[in-house]
C-alpha cells in the first residue's frame, strides 16, 4: 500500500452488472462485478469538534460546472482535484487530519473475505399489496370478486382511523437495502474491478457501499 492511501472498513464502488465464472472443478459461480473507483478523503470529522470520529469520502465524477460552491470549497480545502458527485461518511475509531485528500485502498478486501453490501434497490413503480408485501390475496376461483385487493384496512368506531404505516398499495423499490455475509471472489486492482458472489441491491451503474461483514469476521 502506498503512502497516499489509507485502509478503512468500507469503500464505495459502482455495480457494473452480473456474470458467472467457473472454479477448478467446472462449477459455475454467479458473481456481481463491481467497478473500483477512487474514494477520496474530503473531510475529517473529530470527536472534539463534531461529536464523533469519521471520514467524509468523495466518489464519482462530473463536470466542474455542475459543482456548487460549498462542495468546491470542501474539495479545494482537501486538495482534491477530482470533481466528485457524491459524499458519504465512514465512521472510524480514530482519525488523523493528515489523511485529508488521501485515497482509500481496496486491498483490505481479499478473496474469501465476507462483506456486507448496501445499495439502492431498483424502482418498480406503483405496486399492489401482493407484490409489495407478499399478501396472500383472495380466492382465484369463479364466483369471487376479491382477487388482489388488500382487504379491510380499518377497525371499528374506535379508533375510527387507519393506523400509520398500514401496509397498503404504493411505490415499490428505491429504498436503501443491505445484503449481508456475501463472499469476495476476486479483486483485480490493475483491471479495476472486484467480483462478489451472488447478487446485490441496485441497478447497473449504481453506487454501492462495501463493508467488512458485521456478523462474520
Q: Would you name each region that the model predicts?
A:
Residues 1-217:
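Extended basic (Lys/Arg/His-rich) segments that typically form rRNA-contacting surfaces
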Amino acid at each position: 500500500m502506498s503512502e497516499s492511501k489509507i485502509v478503512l472498513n468500507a469503500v464505495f464502488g459502482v455495480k457494473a452488472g452480473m456474470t458467472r465464472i467457473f472454479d477448478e472443478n467446472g462449477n459455475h459461480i454467479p458473481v456481481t462485478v463491481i467497478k473500483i473507483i477512487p474514494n477520496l478523503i474530503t473531510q475529517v470529522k473529530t470527536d472534539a469538534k463534531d461529536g464523533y470520529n469519521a471520514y467524509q469520502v468523495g466518489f464519482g465524477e462530473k463536470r466542474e460546472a455542475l459543482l456548487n460552491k460549498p462542495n468546491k470549497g470542501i474539495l479545494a480545502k482537501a486538495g482534491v482535484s477530482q470533481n466528485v458527485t457524491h459524499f458519504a461518511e465512514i465512521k472510524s475509531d480514530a482519525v488523523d487530519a493528515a489523511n485529508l485528500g488521501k485515497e482509500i485502498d481496496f486491498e483490505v478486501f481479499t478473496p474469501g473475505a465476507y462483506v456486507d453490501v448496501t445499495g439502492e434497490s431498483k424502482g418498480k413503480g406503483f405496486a399492489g399489496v401482493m407484490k409489495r408485501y407478499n399478501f396472500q390475496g383472495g380466492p382465484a376461483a369463479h364466483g369471487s370478486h376479491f382477487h388482489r385487493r388488500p382487504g379491510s384496512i380499518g377497525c371499528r368506531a374506535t379508533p375510527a382511523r387507519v393506523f400509520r404505516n398500514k401496509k397498503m398499495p404504493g411505490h415499490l423499490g428505491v429504498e436503501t437495502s443491505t445484503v449481508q455475509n456475501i463472499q469476495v471472489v476476486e479483486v483485480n486492482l490493475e483491471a479495476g474491478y472486484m467480483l462478489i458472489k451472488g447478487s446485490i441491491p441496485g441497478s447497473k451503474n449504481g453506487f454501492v457501499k462495501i463493508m467488512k461483514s458485521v456478523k462474520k469476521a
